[in-house]
């Protein structure tokens, strides 16, 4: 689909998805995802949008405001937001981003663990495994090849790569949780 929001460039695309009852009960699942080109001045504020949001900044920069803090993100950084809480994000300079609103039975647990170790805005040594999976999610919708178990696996792979990076590079309590 094409967005008609102000400050979203026309080449931007996004997809909306409603998972099955089985998918909601046992999988990670995307709700909306896309590849956006934001013009300078884009800003969005929400009191809530029941999901978690993963953004990968391919080019440019973004700013993020959660209920407690403000952050800046630049190219090759990820942003992870709990959209159940008030939040804002936008860009002053323009940016190109891959993004996915997702949820699932374990989404909050993964979110809390990742953010507690990496923060809301973070980079990882090699973003390609995570960005390739994010692109695969978007491509699944583009090609109308929707397989809930596979979409869940892609989201799980992305989140797990963040946890493994956290454990490997932060050497903290999460290592015991991840390595058994």
Language-model region placement:
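N-terminal regulatory/effector-sensing and dimerization cores
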Residues: 24-118
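A short, Lys/Arg-enriched amphipathic alpha-helix from helix-turn-helix/homeodomain DNA-binding modules
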Residues: 127-139, 151-155, 166-180
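A general structural signal marking secondary-structure boundaries and capping sites
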Residues: 37-40, 83, 138-145, 162-169
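Hydrophobic alpha-helical core bundles mediating ligand binding, dimerization, or RNAP-core interactions
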Residues: 97, 107, 134-141, 155-162
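A short, N-terminal "cap"/entry segment at the start of jelly-roll beta-barrel domains
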Residues: 1-29, 140, 146, 167
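Short, polar/flexible loop-turn hinges at active-site or ligand-entry regions and domain interfaces
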Residues: 43, 117-123, 144-145, 169-170
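Amphipathic, well-ordered alpha-helical segments in soluble domains
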Residues: 29-32, 53-56, 129-133, 154, ...
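Aromatic/histidine-rich interaction motifs
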Residues: 113-135
